UniProtKB/Swiss-Prot annotation:
GO terms assigned for molecular function: imidazoleglycerol-phosphate dehydratase activity
NCBIfam families according to UniProt: PRK00951.2-1, PRK00951.2-4
UniProt name for this protein: Imidazoleglycerol-phosphate dehydratase
Record bears the keyword Amino-acid biosynthesis: yes
Family recorded in the similarity comment: Belongs to the imidazoleglycerol-phosphate dehydratase family.
Broad class of where this protein is predominantly found: cytoplasm
Native source organism of the sequence: Chlorobium phaeobacteroides (strain DSM 266 / SMG 266 / 2430)
The encoding gene: hisB
The enzyme's E.C. designation: 4.2.1.19
SUPFAM superfamilies membership: Ribosomal protein S5 domain 2-like (SSF54211)
Associated pathway: Amino-acid biosynthesis; L-histidine biosynthesis; L-histidine from 5-phospho-alpha-D-ribose 1-diphosphate: step 6/9
Length: 200
């Protein structure tokens, strides 16, 4: 980009309050990988901290949810609000790389993520987990998290486990592959909208 052009700060804060959850998220895309995460679900906090560290995003998240019922509402709504914040922080997507992909190992597990920030919300998820729950987190919610995220982030996300046995390793590899795919996709590599339509 021309030297006299100052890149805008890509950040956004989004809040969402319902009868089930009360959530505020701040995202800084061009950050240092710092995460201050309090979703109320310890394992989800761990996964989101990993996402921040490996994507380079900074994120502050607080969620007060109806965990006395179960983790479903909190996990789903956290994903929806994060997706909205990222979408808003991407501004008009001028110069965006747009596409990103990564294959990430974690011991015996191997995860793949490919994504498109082109405004088309769709998630394809191929993974199975033997353990139904980890630290209060229902593993069936991994897929639902990414489906919800894709909706509000307006992104096409493909995730798959290629190898693996340990449930924790597989889920962490998925989040890390998503992090590295996002790190690639949000790079500014040009000066125009990356679409023949002229708008994303």
């Amino acid at each position: 980009m021309p030297e006299n052009v100052v890149n805008p700060v890509r950040t956004a804060t989004v809040s969402r309050k319902t009868k089930e959850t009360d959530i505020t998220v701040t995202v800084l895309i061009d950050g240092t990988g710092h995460g201050s995460i309090n979703s109320g679900v310890a394992f989800l906090d761990h996964m989101l901290a990993n996402f921040c560290r490996h994507s380079g995003f900074d994120m502050s998240l607080v969620c007060n949810g109806d965990l006395d019922v179960d983790d479903h509402h909190s996990v789903e709504d956290v994903a929806l609000v994060i997706g909205s914040a990222i979408s808003e922080a991407l501004l008009d997507k001028t110069g965006l790389q747009r596409y990103g992909w990564a294959i990430i190992p974690m011991d015996e597990a191997l995860a793949r993520c490919a994504l498109d920030l082109g405004g088309r919300s769709y998630c394809v998820f191929n993974a199975e987990f033997k353990r139904p729950v980890i630290e209060g987190f229902s593993t069936e919610m991994v897929e639902h998290f990414f489906v919800s995220l894709s909706r509000t982030m307006q992104a096409n996300i493909h995730l798959a486990i290629l190898e693996g046995k340990n449930t924790h390793h597989k889920i962490e590899a998925l989040f890390k592959s998503f992090a590295y795919a996002m790190k690639d996709a949000v790079r500014i590599t040009g000066t125009t909208i990356p679409s023949t339509k002229g708008k994303l």
